Amino acid sequence: MTKPSRHFALTPDAIASLPEKDWQAFRPGVSLYPLHGQPPGAQSSALLRYQPGARVPSHTHLGVEHIFVVQGSQEDESGHYPAGTLLISPTGSSHQVASAEGCIVLAV
């Protein structure tokens, strides 16, 4: 007898076909698709979808944040990050995020 899997895979095709109704407004031009946990204060993960030109105002991280750029590109004061980039923002770090072309990122 095999044990049930405790994980799931989210392929690029699966991300592209996520139901529009399940995306939640997060910031103007940015929507959120919760994957695990309930922020704030809890361990959580979500997809963030930026429309072209969307910005998230300057903010300070209360904990470590990991961002993986899945599609498109994202930028902040420190650089430009194309698909495939992993960003790690330590506790207490601040930045303002934008996406000129639009993107989808995984935030943990």
Predicted regions and their residues:
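Short histidine-centered beta-strand/loop micro-motifs
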Residues: H36, A46-L48, P57-H61, S78-G79, ...
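Structural motif
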Residues: Q43-S45, I67, G102-I104
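Ligand-binding loop in jelly-roll beta-barrel domains
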Residues: T91-V108
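Glycine- and acidic-residue-biased ligand/ion/polar-headgroup-sensing regions
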Residues: Q51-A54, H61-D76, A83
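Histidine-centered metal-chelating micro-motifs
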Residues: A54-P57, E75, L87-Q96
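Conserved hydrophobic/aromatic beta-strand scaffold that supports enzyme active sites
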Residues: L32-P34, S45-R49, H66, L86-I88, ...
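A short, N-terminal "cap"/entry segment at the start of jelly-roll beta-barrel domains
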Residues: M1-A42
